[in-house]
């Protein structure tokens, strides 16, 4: 059982404070760190920040850390719960918080403990973390995912004019995760050369998630650059393209989207309606091998979401729309608004609820894509999560910046450990199991 738990402040990949939790059992120390997003959905569980502008620009997490050390820890130790009782531990903490969005203790406090318990539970049972997660979800097999590498950054993640937040490559034609990594990294380096030749060396500086942020305004130009890099690498037909538009970031009001939202007092020439935006995506899909579009519209623009989803066979992913929240997922299912859940553990705030969100999506015929946040740490829990939940797809940045590679490298190790029994999602990434 749990002998000691201690939380502290550490720093994420953007230099912002976040919560880290050390949990001790007779099997040793188990450490977990909590990630943080830049473009956060209004319906997410509450990430507790102190708001004291004189410290860390208001982003300190002293209260969340204090809530772990002074509230959660004494109660959970007193309860006598074991680390193998993930569901019971998570339910206990949620009850202790008592609010729907974890605003009393903070989702970042609860999640830190929940992740550490999960790691300790696997060790207690003497099994790998991914296998423990599979057991928690009642899965017999595990599957290695197709990585979605975010190679061009725009939106709130980059200082360029590009409105759409992420342009990704998915090596669906690979036969193993190792091969997918080779294909992804080779295209990444070709893309760097293409951007350098066209825009100069300073255009190859990287954004928060390791992708390039060339100063382009036209979203189609980003797709052209990627297509050229795929061709140069010799992977045409083997690598497909995904997008995360994060359209809530440039939604104005009255169904108007501003593709030049980063220019203050712009001339309004880039303002378009939801239907025009949908037409733009349809054009993209005709001209490029696009297989997945995330958050194509504002998080409350249900009608345009449903129109888009009913009118295309590609994967439409809900992130800001669903925020890993069962209530939002249920509404999206009823409205047929999307076809895939983006799973972010810190949007819902515990391991059990994350697994439940995936199972709810799967039950309704959706896919699930596991995701990092733009403010990441070296913790690679989501690598084991994606393998254990057999979701078949993960996005955790470009093959650049160690907090991104930490996850991809862990999946490589898992593939090696599974040996000849390793199953790779490949072309079936949307419904691998």
From Swiss-Prot:
Its cofactor is Mg(2+). It comes from the Eukaryota. The keyword Acetylation applies. Pathway: Carbohydrate degradation; glycolysis; pyruvate from D-glyceraldehyde 3-phosphate: step 4/5. Keywords: Acetylation, Cytoplasm, Glycolysis, Lyase, Magnesium, Metal-binding. CDD domains: enolase. GO terms for cellular component: phosphopyruvate hydratase complex. Inhibited by 2-phosphoglycolic acid. The active site is at residues 209, 344. It is found in: Cytoplasm. Disulfide bonds: none annotated. The keyword Metal-binding applies. One of its GO terms (molecular function) is magnesium ion binding. Mg(2+) is required for catalysis and for stabilizing the dimer. Crystallized with Mn(2+). InterPro entries: Enolase, Enolase-like_C_sf, Enolase-like_N, Enolase_C, Enolase_CS, Enolase_N. It catalyses: (2R)-2-phosphoglycerate = phosphoenolpyruvate + H2O. Its EC number is 4.2.1.11. One of its GO terms (biological process) is glycolytic process. The modification N-acetylserine is found at residue 1. Pfam families: Enolase_C, Enolase_N. Mn(2+) binds at residues 244, 294, 319. (2R)-2-phosphoglycerate binds at residues 36, 157, 344, 373-374. Homodimer. PANTHER family: ENOLASE (PTHR11902:SF1). Belongs to the enolase family. This is Enolase. It comes from Homarus gammarus (European lobster).
């Amino acid at each position: 059982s749990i002998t000691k738990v201690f939380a502290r402040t550490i720093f994420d990949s953007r230099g912002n404070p976040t919560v880290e939790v050390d949990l001790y059992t007779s099997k040793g120390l188990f450490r977990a760190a909590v990630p943080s997003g830049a473009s956060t959905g209004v319906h997410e569980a509450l990430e507790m920040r102190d708001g004291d502008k004189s410290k860390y620009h208001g982003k300190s997490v002293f209260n969340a850390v204090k809530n772990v050390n002074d509230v959660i820890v004494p109660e959970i130790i007193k309860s006598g719960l074991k680390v193998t009782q993930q569901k019971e531990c998570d339910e206990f903490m949620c009850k202790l918080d008592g609010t729907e969005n974890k605003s009393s203790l903070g989702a970042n406090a609860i999640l830190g403990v929940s992740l550490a318990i999960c790691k300790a539970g696997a060790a207690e049972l003497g099994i790998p973390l991914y296998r423990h997660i599979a057991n928690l979800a009642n899965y017999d097999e595990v599957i290695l995912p197709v990585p979605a590498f975010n190679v061009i950054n725009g939106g709130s993640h980059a200082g360029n004019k590009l409105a759409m937040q992420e342009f990704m490559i998915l090596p669906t034609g690979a036969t193993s995760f190792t091969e997918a990594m080779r294909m992804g990294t080779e295209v990444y380096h070709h893309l760097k050369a293409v951007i350098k030749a066209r825009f100069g060396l300073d255009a190859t500086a990287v954004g928060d998630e390791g992708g390039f942020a060339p100063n382009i305004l036209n979203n189609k130009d980003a797709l052209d650059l990627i297509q050229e890099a795929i061709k140069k690498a010799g992977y045409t037909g083997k690598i497909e393209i995904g997008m995360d538009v994060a359209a809530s970031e440039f939604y104005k009001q009255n169904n108007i989207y501003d593709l030049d939202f980063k220019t203050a007092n712009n001339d309004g020439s880039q303002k378009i309606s939801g239907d025009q935006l949908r037409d733009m995506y349809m054009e993209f899909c005709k001209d490029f091998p696009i297989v997945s579009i995330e958050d194509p519209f504002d998080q409350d623009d249900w009608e345009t979401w449903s129109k888009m989803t009913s009118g295309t066979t590609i994967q439409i992913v809900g992130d800001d729309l669903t925020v890993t929240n069962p209530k939002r997922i249920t509404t999206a299912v009823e409205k047929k608004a999307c076809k895939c859940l983006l799973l972010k553990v810190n949007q819902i705030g515990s391991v059990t609820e994350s697994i439940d969100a995936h199972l709810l999506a799967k039950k309704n015929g959706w896919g699930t894509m596991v995701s990092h946040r733009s403010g990441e740490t070296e913790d690679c829990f989501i690598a084991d999560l994606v393998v254990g939940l057999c979701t078949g797809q993960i996005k955790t940045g470009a093959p650049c910046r160690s907090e991104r590679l930490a996850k991809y490298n862990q999946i490589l190790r898992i593939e090696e450990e599974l040996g000849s029994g390793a199953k790779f999602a490949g072309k079936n990434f949307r419904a691998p199991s």
